[in-house]
């Protein structure tokens, strides 16, 4: 589902009837209000989501939390904590591995939301936040632990 029909009740009911897991590509910084119209209590996988940056040379601004130091990591921690807290969300997939080139891909999209930039230089703080979140996922989801404490 990649269009305005995302939250049409009939599509969600039909998806839940024939799919074990329903997936969405969404880019919010929080999932507290995520409740697809007509979707019963079935597992949901967020198959494409990200937090961008405004500090590494690209112009696209999808889910860009700002340019101040640490903004991207704090936004990622908030996004992941929100997803991990949602009772229906069973996973969230980061899109994508590399930043997009400045001149854009085939459709002109040129976002800076990769784990590495276009020269394969890792965003080490962002990778560390992802790693820490992955390590804490199960204890947090089970209620036995707290989530990331970022400055």
List where the protein language model places each region.
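Glycoside hydrolase catalytic-domain groove-lining segments
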Residues: 2-63, 77, 81
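Alpha-helical structural signal in soluble globular domains
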Residues: 13, 18, 82, 86, ...
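A short acidic, glycine-rich active-site loop
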Residues: 64-71
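Long, C-terminal catalytic modules of enzymes
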Residues: 69, 77-111
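Aromatic-rich peripheral "rim/lid" segments of glycoside hydrolase catalytic domains that contact
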Residues: 95-151
């Amino acid at each position: 589902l990649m269009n305005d029909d995302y939250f049409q009740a009939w599509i969600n009911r039909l998806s839940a009837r024939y799919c074990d897991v329903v997936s969405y590509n969404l880019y919010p910084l929080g999932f507290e209000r995520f409740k697809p119209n007509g979707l019963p209590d079935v597992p949901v996988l967020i198959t494409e989501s990200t937090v961008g940056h405004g500090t590494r040379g690209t112009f696209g601004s999808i889910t860009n939390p700002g340019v101040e130091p640490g903004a991207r990591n704090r936004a990622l921690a908030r996004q992941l904590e929100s997803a991990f807290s949602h009772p229906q969300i069973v996973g969230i997939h980061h899109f994508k591995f590399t930043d997009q080139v400045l001149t854009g891909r085939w459709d002109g999209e040129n976002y800076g939301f990769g784990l590495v930039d276009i020269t394969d230089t890792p965003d080490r703080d962002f990778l560390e936040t992802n790693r820490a979140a992955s390590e804490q996922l199960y204890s947090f989801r089970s209620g036995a632990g707290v989530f990331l404490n970022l400055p």
